[in-house]
Amino acid sequence: MRIVSLGGLEEIGRNMTVFEYGGKLLIVDCGVLFPEEHHPGVDLILPDFSYLRDRLNDIVGVVLTHGHEDHIGGVPYLLKERSDIPLISAKLTLAFIKTKLQEHRITAKTVQVKEGDRKKFGPFDLEFLAVNHSIPDGMAVAIRTGAGLVLATGDFKMDQFPLDGRITDLAGFARLGEEG
């Protein structure tokens, strides 16, 4: 398995990671970076899609871990490259995305998941786990392939008493750790 970050490392924002296996690509998050004062006239900064342009037809889906702009803000721009890429996420995150896509006049294929769900997209077997964050409905995704297991957590916090009662699934994280 090859893992390529297209944004989000050593910066706060533009989160986007590509997982490659068996000739197929799975993307986790597709966010924007908000410019600072040394970027006058710039509204937002996108991940660099050039790595994907020759392989758009190999993308099996985009998993969105939660609804913050630094994780979902680039989705309309990716879908302008290929509009039928499935967007995979929790109910609230998909609601945010649908509203954002309406502004761009894009209709997306969406797949709603919840914690505990397992879904297969190409060679990727995905398992979704609850995470707590400053926005409801956050999820981590365990990505299984013939090469092994990777856990992509997105952003999360360790709050044992969140307002919505939904805590990070530490038992699930431990189980995945035992699995390897």
What is each PLM-predicted segment?
Residues 1-63, 68-180:
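His/Asp/Glu-rich metal-coordinating catalytic cores
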